[in-house]
């Protein structure tokens, strides 16, 4: 399954948190199983992630606009956290 399909399935059947601040909260609570960041995610947030051991991350090849579209949202999404994957295989796709 490709990433966009896996992401959509996770959004529909699991628990996905959108936005940098909400993603940080999810990481701090220990709820984030996978963090996805857009290729153009701000360096400040990328630096924050690099200091978090044990957090699986996936860098989406597109921009925040494209990641938002992949989520089915009409707005920019520069970061998101997968807390529950639902029926998706997205947790196997980290890189």
Swiss-Prot record:
Pfam families: Ribosomal_L7Ae. Belongs to the eukaryotic ribosomal protein eL30 family. GO terms for cellular component: cytosolic large ribosomal subunit. Keywords: Ribonucleoprotein, Ribosomal protein. The gene is rpl30e. Gene3D superfamilies: 3.30.1330.30. This is Large ribosomal subunit protein eL30. It comes from the Archaea. It comes from Methanospirillum hungatei JF-1 (strain ATCC 27890 / DSM 864 / NBRC 100397 / JF-1). One of its GO terms (biological process) is translation. GO terms for molecular function: RNA binding; structural constituent of ribosome.
């Amino acid at each position: 399954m490709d990433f966009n399909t896996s992401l959509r399935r996770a959004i529909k059947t699991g628990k996905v948190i959108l936005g940098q601040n909400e993603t940080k909260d999810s990481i701090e609570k220990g709820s984030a199983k996978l963090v996805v960041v857009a290729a153009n995610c701000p360096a400040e947030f990328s630096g924050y992630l690099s200091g978090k051991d044990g957090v699986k991350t996936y860098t989406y090849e597109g921009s925040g606009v494209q990641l938002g579209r992949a989520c089915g949202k009409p707005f920019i999404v520069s970061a998101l956290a997968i807390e529950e994957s639902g029926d998706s295989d997205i947790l196997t796709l980290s890189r």
